[in-house]
Structures are given as structure tokens and as C-alpha cells.
Swiss-Prot record:
This is Maturase K. It comes from Thryptomene saxicola (Rock thryptomene). GO terms for biological process: mRNA processing; RNA splicing; tRNA processing. It is found in: Plastid, Chloroplast. Belongs to the intron maturase 2 family. MatK subfamily. GO terms for cellular component: chloroplast. GO terms for molecular function: RNA binding. Pfam families: Intron_maturas2, MatK_N. Usually encoded in the trnK tRNA gene intron. Probably assists in splicing its own and other chloroplast group II introns. Its main location: plastid. Keywords: Chloroplast, mRNA processing, Plastid, RNA-binding, tRNA processing.
């Protein structure tokens, strides 16, 4: 019991109570906008004194709490012209600074946790592609997978209550409550409001969303560890914090008084893998369908009865891994069963042995990718290249460099694909779209433009690995076939390419 209590309790020494006064510090807004600390963020008028920034912040906060925000005096609209351009501008300015402030307790807690545990601080950036070698190694031994969309909180007040155990300043919590209702304007959070909120203030949205996800993941990790002899190992960092003390005490009561441990014992699964990405997560396990269904209803009950998030059990599908394709980070991944027949003969008896080998494959989903190219005006709905509108003063070299950079980024991102044929089609679209855009900017025909540039223009669209490998290996059929089927994972990619982010 003491061991579990120590696992769940949080040291209060790193909790700071006074965050609201930081809103009146100019450097907070400099950090929020990545500006220099000696530059004013709230206004561009040189006639203002920098010392009056706190007064402007006070005026903005006062205006936010007014019932009718559209009524401004003519004098104020002249002196504060930046307020009249957009009715949500003053709210957005304060919310961007507030997003920096609420991150402070979590950042201090993380630093304190690393120092207390004497963990080596890694300054290397983690690559998105580092997850794929892990999946190639683990998924071939698993049988079932569930792809789940993480539910949002129904009531906005739950997000505020989540942060109460970190942010003790009531003024900051009231301001956060105002921001949530300002953007969503409803007790129910539809997807369109969440999308608008994420675009209006992505930093604050990501902070609230990650705190919501970390809340349920921490309890799920705790209960998962009690359900198996093997402790789970995580490749990420979980913040140790207070997770609804009343609910934690309820967990202890159920766990120890109602023989809950025996119930979890039936869920024992030492081969479960949990991966979260883009508002979704999937559970993969080497287990029976019955136990996967038990974990399914267990998660639903955890969300509904302990986190008040409405979630239907029918939205969680349990699929056999070799029959299911997983859309993951711009790839479509699946496990294929490749059969190999071995003929062996012992004396006069002939034996045929059929072995089924599992292979993890990652392919490029060409239809969604062409849809992204269509939205970016590189091609039409059928995948035919078109001229992308460009600035009239752009030179040919600027247009070509921009297309080359897009093509190189896509090639690097999808270099781990099992089949490169669809990737070559994307290169073809970008190459001809570049020619059409440059010819339109130069008021010439495509034929004339290509003839003027020569064959060197086409060679520039080769990626770095294709150029290097073509110099090392001879141009034989077997070599080109191996390069076509080979996986090349770039371990320096830290963000999802915009064209592969279909959602």
C-alpha cells in the first residue's frame, strides 16, 4: 500500500501559486512570439512607452470580461487601433501569453524530476521515424490491434479541474475558464470549435490537450502495471503529478477492498504495446480476442465513469493484425504473411513444409497523398499536374528551389516505404507542376522552358540517396530492384510533413 501511495503522490514543493502577475510582464509575450526581449509585442506604435505595457494588458483583460466587447469609444479606437482590427485579437494576445505561463509549473516539475532521479538529459532530438524500426521488430510477433480515437471531454470545466492541482492561482484558473468558453462558446465541444481553438492558439490548445491525455495515461499505466507480472517500460516521460485525489482514493478502495486485483489478474498481458499519435492510439497485443475485448470495455469504463468522457464501445474495433492496415504518420502499415515451402527428403520419404513468415510493411497511401497535393494546388483531382499560382516577381531559380525542397522533404519522409512506385508518381506530379508554374511565370510554353533548362533540370529532382547510391552501385537490374524495395529511415525527422498530415 505504501509503495502504491508513493507512486501516486506528488511533491508539492514545485507548485507555484502566483502565476497571474506574470501576465503583466512584457518578456512573457516576447517568449510567446519568439521576439526579442527588448521589443514590444502588444503594439507597433513608437509613441508608446514600453513601461505602459502592463496598463495595456490590464485594459485588455478588462475588455475581455465586458459583456459587449464590440462597443468601443472613438477615442480608444484611435489610441488602440490594434484592438479594432479583430474582435478576438485582444483575447488572443492574452491567451498566447497565458499559454507560456501555465507551462512553467510543468517545466519546473520535469527538471526537478530529472535531477532527483539523476537521469541523463538527452539533447538529441527524437525522430518520428524511430518508431518504425520498433514496430518492425515488435509487431511481427503480435496478433491483434485496436485503433482508437481518443475522446474529448464533454464539459469544459473538467479541463479546468484537471489543472487545479498544478495551478493554485484562482485568478489564472478563472482566466483559463474564460478562454475556453470564449473559443468554444458552449458546454459541448464540437470538432469545429476544437479546430478553431487549435488554430487560434495552438500552444494553449496543445498544453490543455496533453494534460488531458496525460491524465488518463498515467492512471492507465498504473493499473496496467498491476495487471501483469512484467512491468511496462516506456519510451516517453510521464509526469508524476496529482491525478484527481478522490478518484485515486476510489481506485485504492476498489483495488484492495473489492478484490479488484483478481479481476485485473484476468487481464494479464505481458505483450501489450501502446502507441499514441495525432489524437489516436492503438493497442497491439499477442493475446486472445476475449482478453482484448475485456481491455476494450475496461478502457470505456475508465473514460466514462472516472473521466466523464462519453465513449461508445462500438467505436473500438479489434482486428487481426495480418488482416488490418493501420494508417500511421503518413504511412499505411500492415503485417503480411509470406509463405515459403521447403522440400526435404529423408531416405525415400519426401516432406513439404510450409512456413508462414510475418513481415511488417509500410506503404505510401497514394490516394490521400494526391488529395493533399490537390488541396495545395499541385494537381487536379485526377492527379494531373497543374500550374501552382506563384508570385509574379519570383525568379525561375526561386520556383525550382521551392519545388525541390518540397520534393526532397517528401522523399525523405516516405523513404521507408516498402514500395517506391507511388512515391515516384508524386515526384512526377511535383516536377511537371514546377515546370508549368515556372513557364507561366516566365510567360513561355512548357516545351520552351524545358528546352532552355536542359536535362540537368530533371536530374535535380533526384533525392540525395538516389544520387549517392547510383554512384556507389552499378546500374544493373538487380541493384535497382533492391533499391526499389529497400527501407531507408531518416532518423532526423522531428515533425510531420504538411502534405502527409491528411486530417
Amino acid at each position: 500500500m505504501e509503495e502504491f501511495q508513493g507512486y501516486l503522490e506528488v511533491d508539492r514543493s514545485q507548485q507555484h501559486d502566483l502565476l497571474y502577475p506574470l501576465l503583466f510582464r512584457e518578456y512573457i509575450y516576447a517568449l510567446a512570439h519568439d521576439h526579442g526581449l527588448n521589443r514590444s509585442i502588444l503594439f507597433e506604435n513608437a509613441g508608446y512607452d514600453n513601461k505602459s505595457s502592463s496598463i495595456i494588458v490590464k485594459r485588455l483583460i478588462t475588455r475581455m470580461y465586458q459583456q459587449n466587447r464590440l462597443i468601443f469609444s472613438s477615442k480608444d479606437s484611435i489610441q488602440n487601433q490594434f484592438i479594432g482590427h479583430n474582435k478576438n485579437l485582444y483575447s488572443q494576445i492574452i491567451s498566447e501569453g497565458f499559454a507560456v505561463i501555465v507551462e512553467i509549473p510543468f517545466s519546473l516539475r520535469l527538471v526537478f524530476s530529472l535531477e532527483r532521479k539523476e537521469m541523463a538529459k538527452s539533447h538529441n532530438l527524437r525522430s518520428i521515424h524511430s518508431i518504425f524500426p520498433f514496430l518492425e521488430d515488435k509487431f511481427t510477433h503480435l496478433d491483434y490491434v485496436s485503433d482508437v480515437l481518443i475522446p474529448y471531454y464533454i464539459h469544459l470545466e473538467i479541463l479546468v479541474q484537471t489543472l487545479r492541482y498544478w495551478v493554485k492561482d484562482s485568478s489564472s484558473l478563472h482566466l483559463l475558464r474564460f478562454f475556453l468558453h470564449e473559443y468554444c462558446n458552449s458546454l459541448i465541444t464540437p470538432k469545429k470549435h476544437i479546430t478553431f481553438f487549435s488554430k487560434g492558439n495552438p500552444r494553449l490548445f496543445l498544453f490543455l490537450y496533453n494534460s488531458h491525455i496525460c491524465e488518463y495515461e498515467y492512471i492507465f499505466l498504473f493499473l496496467r502495471n498491476q495487471s501483469s507480472h512484467l512491468r511496462s517500460t516506456s519510451s516517453g516521460i510521464f509526469f508524476e503529478r496529482i491525478y484527481f485525489y478522490v478518484k485515486i482514493e476510489h481506485f485504492f478502495k476498489v483495488f484492495f477492498d473489492n478484490n479488484f486485483q483478481c479481476t485485473l489478474w484476468f487481464f494479464k498481458d505481458p505483450f501489450m504495446h501502446y502507441v499514441r499519435y495525432q489524437g489516436k492510439f492503438f493497442l497491439a497485443s499477442k493475446d486472445t480476442s476475449l482478453r482484448m475485448n475485456k481491455w476494450k470495455y475496461y478502457l470505456v469504463n475508465l473514460w466514462q465513469y472516472h473521466f466523464y468522457a462519453w465513449f461508445k464501445p462500438g467505436r473500438i474495433d479489434i482486428n487481426q493484425l495480418f488482416k488490418y492496415s493501420l494508417d500511421f504518420l503518413g504511412y499505411r502499415s500492415n503485417v503480411r504473411l509470406n509463405s515459403s515451402v521447403v522440400r526435404s527428403q529423408m531416405l525415400z520419404n519426401l516432406f513439404l513444409i510450409n512456413n508462414a513468415m510475418k513481415k511488417f510493411e509500410t506503404i505510401v497511401p497514394i490516394i490521400p497523398l494526391i488529395g493533399s497535393l490537390y488541396k495545395a494546388n499541385f494537381c487536379n483531382t485526377f492527379g494531373h499536374p497543374i500550374s501552382k499560382p506563384t508570385r509574379t516577381d519570383s525568379s525561375d531559380s526561386d520556383i525550382i528551389d521551392r519545388f525541390l525542397r518540397i520534393c526532397r522533404n517528401l522523399s525523405h519522409y516516405h523513404s521507408g516505404s516498402s514500395k517506391k512506385k507511388s512515391l515516384y508518381r508524386v515526384k512526377y506530379i511535383l516536377r511537371l507542376s514546377c515546370v508549368x508554374x515556372x513557364x507561366x511565370x516566365x510567360x513561355x510554353t512548357v516545351r520552351t522552358f524545358v528546352k532552355r533548362l536542359g536535362s540537368e533540370f530533371l536530374e535535380e529532382f533526384l533525392t540525395e540517396e538516389e544520387v549517392v547510391l547510383s554512384l556507389i552501385f552499378p546500374r544493373t537490374y538487380s541493384t535497382s530492384r533492391r533499391l526499389y524495395r529497400g527501407h531507408i529511415w531518416y532518423l532526423d525527422i522531428t515533425s510531420i510533413n504538411d502534405l502527409v498530415n491528411y486530417e
